Regions:
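Glycine-rich loops and low-complexity Gly/Arg-rich segments
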Residues: 29-32, 53-57, 64-65
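Short pre-active-site segment immediately N-terminal to the catalytic Zn-binding motif
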Residues: 15-41, 51
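Nuclease and nuclease-like effector domains acting on nucleic acids or nucleotide cofactors
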Residues: 1-3, 37, 62
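Short, solvent-exposed loop/turn segments at secondary-structure junctions
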Residues: 10-11, 35, 55
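Metalloprotease/metallohydrolase-associated module, dominated by Zn2+-dependent proteases
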Residues: 2-6, 11, 66-146
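Catalytic Zn2+-binding segment of zinc metalloproteases
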Residues: 44-60
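Soluble or luminal CAZymes and related metallo-dependent hydrolases
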Residues: 39, 45, 49, 113-117
Length: 146
């Protein structure tokens, strides 16, 4: 299955600023015609995180779907983004009150970099063996390390 889409129209539509690549629902979309191995490893780490979050959300979602409402099944593909968003928001509030410099987008950048998902991907993107050596749920170890 093709998971990297180069020169993606969707990537060009949704990405802004210096961002050129995104992992979206398990697919890697990029504005570029080719990616470095470092960027591919970074985005593949996000792919693994996404599928692990789907696994975590699957059991409660299926149970709630049978006993409450089938709408709970939407939690499975959205859990990664919900977790990412909540984590980013908490980090944003933290950095609003603790950073010396608030203007110029620094708070948002600091909140983005403080994400457990981003920390794992960024710290291991230069290791060519990381994806083979990586343990399930490795991103969980980065919580609380702002």
């Amino acid at each position: 299955m093709k998971t990297i889409y180069y020169n993606s129209k969707l990537a060009k539509l949704i990405l802004f600023g210096s961002y050129h690549t995104i992992m979206l629902f398990g697919f890697i979309l990029t504005k570029l015609k080719e990616l470095s191995e470092t960027t591919i490893r970074h985005e593949r780490t996000h792919q693994k995180q996404f599928f692990e979050c789907m696994e975590i959300a699957a059991v409660p979602s299926v149970l709630l779907a049978f006993h409450v409402s089938a709408w709970w099944l939407l939690l499975i593909p959205l859990f990664y983004y919900i977790l990412y968003g909540v984590e980013w928001f908490i980090s944003l509030v933290y950095h609003l009150f603790t950073d010396d410099e608030v203007g110029g987008g620094k708070v948002n950048a600091n909140a983005y970099r403080a994400s457990a998902f981003e920390m794992e991907a960024k710290l291991n993107q230069d290791n060519p063996n990381y994806l083979k050596e990586r343990k399930w749920g490795a991103w969980l170890h980065y919580y609380g390390k702002i």
